[in-house]
């Protein structure tokens, strides 16, 4: 976002390998208001941390907010401790679409306990200038586990927002027969 206007630029190349991309972004620093880093996994792109450090050195960080979507498989401790505190606001949204073995299936070779440990470290830095959320994209693979997921996230202490998968349509929950979906909203009853 520059001067109140959201900018969409033609993709120059895969950012990690494109010097032109980083030069273009650096030229925009004086007017930047917001940076949005989304997946793949933005914490694996070292150049973006270099960019943030340049912004801090230019004394522009206090005017810029940052948003991340991450899968919680990486823990950027240096940024947590030394870079992000300089920025106006940082929000990190963890893309978590399942628990335990469901997470590991979707994010192979990631390990659930590692992701939970990483999110726990992030929670230590939660503040008015640093906010955490879990984005749970609901699809045909995880909709039946939604109550369990919401219970876990409430206990874990990071707010969740639900995102409905739209594409591909055959993974959208609207393809599930109505009678099957009813079971999701019914509380579990003991056998009597």
Give residue ranges: language-model regions.
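Catalytic cores of alpha/beta
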Residues: 141-154
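Core AdoMet radical
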Residues: 1-17, 29-46, 58-78, 85-117, ...
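N-terminal cationic-hydrophobic initiation segments that often serve targeting/anchoring roles
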Residues: 26, 56-59, 84, 123-126, ...
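PAPS-dependent sulfotransferase catalytic core
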Residues: 170-181
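Single conserved hydrophobic/aromatic residue that forms the stacking wall/gate
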Residues: 182-192
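Distinct, well-ordered alpha-helical segments
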Residues: 49-53, 76-84, 145-147
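Alpha-helical packing segments of well-folded alpha/beta enzyme cores
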Residues: 21-24, 51, 115-118, 149
């Amino acid at each position: 976002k520059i001067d109140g206007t959201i900018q969409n630029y033609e993709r120059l190349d895969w950012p990690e390998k494109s010097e032109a991309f980083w030069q273009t972004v650096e030229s925009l620093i004086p007017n930047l208001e917001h940076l949005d880093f989304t997946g793949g996994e933005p914490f694996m792109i070292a150049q973006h941390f270099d960019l943030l450090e340049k912004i801090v050195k230019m004394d522009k960080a206090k005017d810029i907010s940052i948003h991340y979507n991450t899968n919680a498989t990486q823990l950027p401790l240096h940024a947590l401790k030394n870079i992000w505190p300089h920025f106006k606001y940082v929000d990190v949204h963890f893309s978590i679409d399942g628990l335990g073995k469901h997470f590991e299936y979707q994010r192979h070779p990631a390990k659930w306990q590692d992701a939970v440990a990483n999110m726990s470290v992030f929670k230590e830095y939660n503040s008015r200038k640093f906010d955490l959320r879990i984005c749970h994209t609901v699809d045909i693979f995880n909709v039946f586990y939604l109550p369990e997921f919401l219970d876990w996230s409430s206990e874990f202490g990071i707010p969740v927002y639900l995102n409905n998968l739209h594409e591909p349509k055959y993974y959208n929950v609207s393809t599930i027969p109505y009678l099957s979906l009813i079971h999701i909203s019914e509380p579990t009853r003991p056998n009597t």
